[in-house]
Amino acid sequence: MLDILTFYTYFVNPTDQGASPIITNLRILITGSNSGFGLLTSLTLARQGHHVIATMRDLDKGAALAATAEAEKLPIEMRTLDVCDPASVEAALADAATIDVLINNAGFEVQGGLEMVDDELMQKQLDTNVIGPLRTIRAVMPAWRRRQSGAIVNVSSTVGIVATPYGGAYSASKFALEGMSEALYMEAKPDNIRVHLIEPGRFSTTNFGSNIVRPDGWVGSELENRQIAFRKALSNLDGKAPPDPQSVADAIVNAAIDPAAPFRNLVGDDAVMLASAYKAAPTYEDFEAGIRERLDWHI
């Protein structure tokens, strides 16, 4: 069994993976750049001098990013890209051979009891969070295999390692992204193409509310009341507010530009705690009991 110290070193601390030169002046395409982690990552990379291709479904929603880029004279190019539209993906990535890094950040979260998620909503969750990244990956891989270089950074979540209640649909999408990324890591390595996962814990940004969808009948239900109690219990992890989301952007940036970055990158103390506890527990029942005790959560 992987002990917690080894787990932390391997999954979290990229400095222990061996020194390697940081790559500069990259052309980096990011999906979902109009808000949240995508917005922060776009600005962070551009401020470091990389050419950022910031993509989103609706360019009108990228006004804040465009204004900052213009004010600071940042190397940011805006493109329309809807990961759920194959034609849009093909058009946005037609110049894949000139792109060095692909960051799959676009996504949304379905919150609600699993039995309340209908087929249409579940299909939308998987199409955006799983099939969408697969579409962008398919668009770049042929050219990258020919030139023998490239890097893919998939933004996942701690719930892609261990599911949490009242978010089963979202967890399912992130579990799928994790499995897809593990397979791609091994498939792409012979052609010198890097693959990385970013696994944030709980983070708060003012722009994330619009990326959450709840099923019909959820608001005011008994299951919603239980979810509220669970989220309140999460504050017992450290007794503090969620950390600065810039730390997630920094982890994405590091994976994009540092060839020595690890495959998995947990971000946040709660992410480390949950993943470590899950890996260390002899059984799932032991993990569940331990989490209930740690959170003082008994509903």
Per-segment meaning from a language model:
Residues 80-91, 119:
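The beta1-alpha1 cofactor-binding region of Rossmann-like NAD(H)/NADP(H)-dependent oxidoreductases
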Residues 113-114, 121-123:
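Substrate-binding pocket helix/loop in short-chain dehydrogenase/reductase
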Residues 137, 173:
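Active-site helix of classical SDR
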Residues 162, 183-194:
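Active-site-adjacent segment of SDR/Rossmann-fold oxidoreductases
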Residues 190-262:
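SDR active-site lid
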